[in-house]
A protein has these predicted regions:
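A surface-exposed partner-binding patch
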Residues: 1-108, 148, 160-243
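Compact, glycine/acidic-enriched structural inserts
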Residues: 110-147
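Alpha-helix N-cap recognition
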Residues: 125-131, 158-165
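Short aromatic loop motif centered on NTY/YTY
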Residues: 152-155
């Protein structure tokens, strides 16, 4: 299904909030052709894919209980360019965590990621926008058993405490994967690498595991590959004598 088809498929669904109130998807107004033309200037190729243009004409987003709102026009609002050079901020949970759609240098609308600040983890949430809409529908129906809630409550902690999603540069250089090797060779020796290419949803990495300073983080220009500086913690003597 296209995003528009997926959204239309859930418009008649009825959900029940935690307070027992019934609710439905509430669409926001769509954009005019001129508004879409203005919006696409912010994209790498200066163009919006046809299926996204269709969606934006239909609606610019929708209201849904449990999310601040789902917004299809939040281009460049998120920041965090070290990890997502071009993105659409789709939704927030009201606590400083966001669902962000990644757009590559060719203007392709790709995966949706859940970006959490506490713990500081990035998770592949949905393969594409249509699946994200499906996951929102599932959240309304299944609550704590939904993909959205499991990632929000469980997956981020698993990545932070059990598997931080990184490999050492030496491991990447020893790989037979040429793209991975080439990316690793471009990084300083004290960097670690996360590779989410072809990884299933709920895969991710602990972007803040080595401290909150991400100014030196690097993203591959076309692949789901990231490099993060691994800052070694200094011992007491090193701190005292500046070594």
């Amino acid at each position: 299904m296209t995003p528009t088809e997926q959204l239309k498929a859930i418009l008649t669904e009825k959900y029940t909030s935690e307070d027992g109130d019934e609710y439905q998807v509430e669409l926001k107004p769509g954009l005019t052709d001129q508004q879409i033309d203005d919006l696409e200037k912010g994209f790498p190729t200066g163009q919006i894919p046809n299926e996204i243009r269709e969606l934006l004409k239909f609606t610019s987003g929708f209201e849904f209980y449990g999310l601040e709102e789902v917004n299809f026009v939040g281009v460049g609002q998120f920041g965090f360019e070290e990890f997502f050079p071009t993105s659409v901020q789709l939704a927030g949970d009201g606590f400083g965590n966001f669902w962000v759609l990644d757009i590559n240098k060719n203007g392709q609308w790709g995966n949706v990621f859940y970006v959490c600040h506490d713990p500081a983890v990035i998770v592949k949430h949905s393969d594409n926008l249509a699946e994200f809409i499906k996951h929102v529908d599932e959240f309304g129906k299944k609550g704590k058993e939904s993909n959205l809630d499991v990632i929000h409550e469980v997956t981020v902690m698993d990545i932070w405490t059990i598997n931080n999603g990184f490999m050492d540069k030496s491991t990447a250089l020893a790989s037979t994967d040429e793209k991975l090797k080439l990316f690793a060779s471009s990084l300083p020796d004290n960097f670690v690498i996360s590779d989410l290419r072809d990884k299933p949803i709920k895969s991710g990495f602990a972007w803040g595991k080595f401290g909150p300073n991400i100014d030196k983080a690097k993203r591959h220009d076309s692949e789901l590959l990231w490099g993060v500086e691994k800052v070694e913690k200094k011992g007491l003597l090193s701190r005292l004598f500046g070594k």
